[in-house]
Amino acid sequence: MELYLDTANVAEVERLARIFPIAGVTTNPSIVAASKESIWDVLPRLQNAIGEEGTLFAQTMSRNAKGMVEEAKRLNNAIPGIVVKIPVTAEGLAAIKLLKKEGIVTLGTAVYSASQGLLAALAGAKYVAPYVNRVDAQGGDGIRMVQELQTLLEHHAPDSMVLAASFKTPRQALDCLLAGCQAITLPLDVAQQMLNTPAVESAIEKFEQDWKNAFGNLNL
């Protein structure tokens, strides 16, 4: 299983990388824009934060296949081994096919249906990123879509994997993992929610109080 953080906040990546067993960091144009940093400045800093073995994801901006391929090559030259995120449009599928031949690893992003995700995988994307909460927000069933996509990839594109994205709650992320997803990416607030469990703090405080009452200190 691969766990990623969905952010361009270098300080938070450094903080959470000490705690979470993260495989890397995913970004998108909105996330990079929110950081107020040039993508060419922030990507090296993110790579440094996750280490040489961490995987970094960044997205192209062009709307046509030729431009996507050119931008993907620029990203790959700047950060060798980066996974390039390509929106799964008609032009995006064409770009994924071309990049597969070039040996550049891709992720098919902005996936709102299982069929769309399958096409990305068949075109050559190593990762496919379904938008769980956004599907829910449009009246669909994000988890059901992920389940269908996971089954389709297992049967027809076993070299590709679901990297589920767009979460508002830890429960959504866990449901994707229960559906068989091999990778998820968490926004910072959802990652923090996984750490903040009031019942755990209450239990620890009770242990400490009992120990202190018995021994007068909190030392072993």
UniProtKB/Swiss-Prot annotation:
Active site: K85
Chief subcellular location: cytoplasm
UniProt cross-references to InterPro entries, sorted A to Z: Aldolase_TIM, F6P_aldolase, TAL/FSA, Transaldolase_3B/F6P_aldolase, Transaldolase_AS, TSA/FSA_arc/bac
Compartments, record wording: Cytoplasm
Gene Ontology terms for molecular function: fructose 6-phosphate aldolase activity
Listed EC numbers: 4.1.2.-
Keyword Transmembrane helix recorded: no
Keyword terms of this UniProt record: Carbohydrate metabolism, Cytoplasm, Lyase, Schiff base
Broadest EC class assigned to this enzyme: lyase
Catalytic reaction annotation: beta-D-fructose 6-phosphate = dihydroxyacetone + D-glyceraldehyde 3-phosphate
Short name of one Pfam family: TAL_FSA
UniProt GO cellular component terms: cytoplasm
Segments crossing the lipid bilayer: none
GO BP of this protein: fructose metabolic process
Protein role: Catalyzes the reversible formation of fructose 6-phosphate from dihydroxyacetone and D-glyceraldehyde 3-phosphate via an aldolization reaction.
Assembly mode: Homodecamer.
Family per record: Belongs to the transaldolase family. Type 3A subfamily.
NCBIfam families, alphabetized: fsa_talC_mipB, PRK12653.1
Protein name (record): Fructose-6-phosphate aldolase
Organism: Salmonella gallinarum (strain 287/91 / NCTC 13346)
Lineage: Bacteria, Pseudomonadati, Pseudomonadota, Gammaproteobacteria, Enterobacterales
